[in-house]
């Protein structure tokens, strides 16, 4: 029945959200360290908190869910930043996350495209 499909999808969405939230918190300091390393000429205090949170959650998604392509994740979080943060946040976040992703690939910690 259609209601079973919706219930199953709700459970999958709920499981995804919980796993993403958990990874964002558990590996938050590791993600922030990587983000900080790529923020050339920027002090963390000058960055919008929302931008840091968005980048942290994006990295959690990239590192935790191998079936979601990197460009899909990046596009989603860049759009999120444009909507919930400052007008320039999308470009800023794109640059930082792209740098972090390239570093993770070089370190062989990220094995997807």
Features from the language model and the residues they span:
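Residue-level detector of well-ordered alpha-helical segments, enriched
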Residues: 1, 16, 50-54, 73, ...
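Short, small-residue-biased leader/transition segments that mark boundaries at the very start
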Residues: 2-6
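Membrane topogenic helices and adjacent juxtamembrane segments
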Residues: 13-35
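Amphipathic alpha-helical elements of HEAT/ARM-like alpha-solenoid repeat scaffolds that form extended
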Residues: 14-21, 51-59, 97
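Strongly charged, low-complexity linkers/loops
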Residues: 28-76
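Alpha-helical oligomerization segments
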Residues: 71-76, 80-113
